[in-house]
């Protein structure tokens, strides 16, 4: 068994390769939900959906969000009616949000709702929300404290971040299913997702760090050189007091990681780390990196 910690970008590219080189029933993915949001009365879980759509074979891999060849008739009509839907939601994608929202309103746990949706999509992997507790990442800006989606989508990441804040009514806890997946795994891989808004929220959930203590943990940096492959990781890391580099990423995961992987293009050597080509520009590159990570995990286990 192998468990990944994942956001919605970076790690799914690695998962694209991993599903080709290992038994898909042996893969568990614990997914960030701190970017979840209710829009137009429906529940969007963007990172969970990206992972689910990837495994279902319907992900739009041009954008790494949404469903391939989706239409946007409803979104366009909502805008025509003067409503402020600032996230462009496809029609099939919206159907998933409607279904999830209905299940949550009926009292279903997010974990169970996700399992139901994955079954409908024929997903064989074990896709797990990080928690059934509602958690939200907000960023402090000149506009005040705003939801991460408002910062990244509505404001296009163009406003200065002063701080990153996690908000929840009660302290978030890892679900029993998450703990079981980690405990059953031979290795845990912290994927190359945003350390601040994708991975840290998972690690902040009660129980998961303790479950990972006795596991072999591999972390993959999201930086190519000193630049993140995608998204606002650099600005978010600086606002959180970390250097926006692979070294800064390693500092985020201090005392948790057994092996840190950074890119061959990284200008700085790191102690107790190895270099691999982590720029996954296509499926073959994703497969190559996945095979190398599996080999490292097997070597450590031997």
UniProtKB/Swiss-Prot annotation:
This is 2-phospho-L-lactate transferase. It catalyses: (2S)-lactyl-2-diphospho-5'-guanosine + 7,8-didemethyl-8-hydroxy-5-deazariboflavin = oxidized coenzyme F420-0 + GMP + H(+). The lineage of its organism: Archaea, Methanobacteriati, Methanobacteriota, Stenosarchaea group, Methanomicrobia. Homodimer. It is an enzyme of class 2 (transferase). One of its GO terms (biological process) is F420-0 metabolic process. Its cofactor is Mg(2+). The keyword Manganese does not apply. Catalyzes the transfer of the 2-phospholactate moiety from (2S)-lactyl-2-diphospho-5'-guanosine to 7,8-didemethyl-8-hydroxy-5-deazariboflavin (FO) with the formation of oxidized coenzyme F420-0 and GMP. It comes from Methanoregula boonei (strain DSM 21154 / JCM 14090 / 6A8). 7,8-didemethyl-8-hydroxy-5-deazariboflavin binds at residue 49. Coiled coil: none annotated. Pathway: Cofactor biosynthesis; coenzyme F420 biosynthesis. It comes from the Archaea. The gene is cofD. Belongs to the CofD family.
